[in-house]
Amino acid sequence: MTNLRKRMLEELQRRNYSPATIRGYLLAVEQFAKHFGKSPDKLGPDELRSYQAYLLTERKLAVGSVVGRVAALRFFFVRTLKRREFWEELPYPKDPKDRRRLPTVLSLDEVARLIDAAGNLMQRALLMTLYGTGMRRMEVSLLKVSDVDSRRMMIRVERGKGGGGRDIPLSPALLETLREYWHWKKPRTYLFPSSLHKRGADRPMSDKAVWYACTEAARHARIKKRVTPHTLRHSWATHLLEAGTDLRTIQVLLGHVDLETTARYLHLSQRHLQAVSNPLEHLQLSSVSQVSREYHRKTDR
C-alpha cells in the first residue's frame, strides 16, 4: 500500500466512513491516477476537469455515478492532501434532465404482507427492525444486543452515517418480537449475527444477507415493487409524515444532516398532499343541484 493510499484510508476511517464507501473512494482515486499514468498528487485542476468530461462524454456514465467519483476525488484532494482550492475546482456535475427518481414506498398493507412473509423468526425480526426504526442497512447489521434499551424504550444507533449517533424510539411490537427472537437465537454481541461462520456470534450479518431477507420476503408476499432495506427506510419515513410527524423530527430519527434530504418525503406522501386545503372549498357557492336546475330551465325555454 502506497503512503498516499494509507493516508487516505486512515482519514476515511477516522471520519467513520462505512467499509463500502471506503472501498469505493479508494478505487475511484486509483482509477483516476491510472487514467493519466501518474501519482494522483501530481495531477491538478486541468486533469480533474478533463477526467470528469471523459467520464460523462466518453464513458457515458450516469450523472449519479460521476457524482460518486467526484466525491471521492474531492475527499482525496481536500481532506487527505489538504488542498482546499480543489473544493471549487471540482464541482459536482448537474443533470440537465434531473433523472433523480423518487424512492419506492410500500403501503401499510404491503409492509404487513412483507413482514408476515419472512422466512424465519430472525428475518421477521430483521424486517421489523428495518421498518420500525428506519435504519440504514449498515446500521442494522452493526446493531448490538446492548444497543436495545427496553427500560428507556430506545434503540441506540452508535455507528450512523458520517459518524453520528442517535436514539430511535422502540416500538412495543418490535420489542416483543426481538425478545421472542432473542430467546430463540440468543445472540451475544451483534443482534443479527452472521450464520456463515463458526464464530458467527462475533460477526455482524452481511449486507447480502440483509438484502436477501428483503427480496425473498417480497417474492413470497408477491409484491411487485423492488424491495430493498432502503425501501423500508423510505416507507417508514413517509408513513411517519402521513401520520403527522413533523419533518424536523423525521430528520433526527433518520440521521439526516440536511433537512433538504428529509424534505423529499413530502413528494412521497399522498396524504400530506391530500391534506392541503384548496381555497376553492372556502367559496360560498350555490349548490350544484340548484345550479343544474337553473341551467336546464334556461335551455328548455
Put a short name on every predicted segment.
Residues 1-301:
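Conserved catalytic core of the tyrosine transesterase superfamily
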